[in-house]
């Protein structure tokens, strides 16, 4: 257990040595792409169905995932911020859920690690537009 927990704790504190152009100086992810009607509908569906994205504001893959949705749709998602130094950090929840990397999606109680296309998310959750 200690062998798994230590790398996670190091990973969660890594942003103190990183500077990222996709985050602001307040520890928040900054999404710049525009959303489509479909991505907004999907984001609302995911939120309404309890889907959660575990993320870290300094994580490049998290930004890539968020940019697929666009800034308007991103605001609709249930996002748990795992970085210890972030605004609204929920690090303990991430540890309790055994989040091993970012982004991680929780869909129907199952954790899925990695960037997922909107099509993949639709298929995994039963979303039909």
Where is each model-derived feature located?
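Local sequence-structure signature of Cys/Sec-based thiol-disulfide redox active-site neighborhoods
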Residues: 35-76
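N-terminal targeting signals for export/organelle localization
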Residues: 1-28, 129
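Gly/Gly-Pro-rich "capping" loops immediately C-terminal to redox-active cysteine motifs
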Residues: 68-85, 122
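Transition segment at domain starts
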Residues: 25-38
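Structural microenvironment flanking redox-active thiols in thiol-disulfide oxidoreductases
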Residues: 84-93
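Non-catalytic, surface beta->alpha helical segment in thiol-disulfide oxidoreductase systems
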Residues: 106-129
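Structural recognition of the beta-strand scaffold that forms the well-ordered cores
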Residues: 52-55, 78-80, 104-106, 111-113
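Structural micro-motif
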Residues: 94-107
């Amino acid at each position: 257990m200690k062998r798994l927990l230590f790398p996670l704790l190091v990973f969660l504190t890594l942003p103190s040595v990183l500077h990222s152009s996709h985050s602001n100086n307040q520890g928040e992810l900054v999404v710049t792409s525009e959303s489509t009607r479909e991505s907004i509908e999907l984001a609302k569906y995911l939120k309404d169905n309890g889907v959660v994205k575990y993320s870290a504001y300094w994580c490049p893959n998290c930004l890539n995932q968020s940019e697929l949705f666009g800034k308007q749709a991103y605001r609709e998602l249930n996002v748990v911020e795992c970085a210890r130094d972030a605004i609204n950090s929920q690090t303990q929840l991430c540890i309790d859920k055994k989040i091993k990397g970012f982004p991680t999606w929780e869909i129907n109680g199952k954790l899925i690690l990695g960037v997922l296309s909107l099509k993949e998310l639709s298929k995994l959750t039963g979303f039909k537009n």
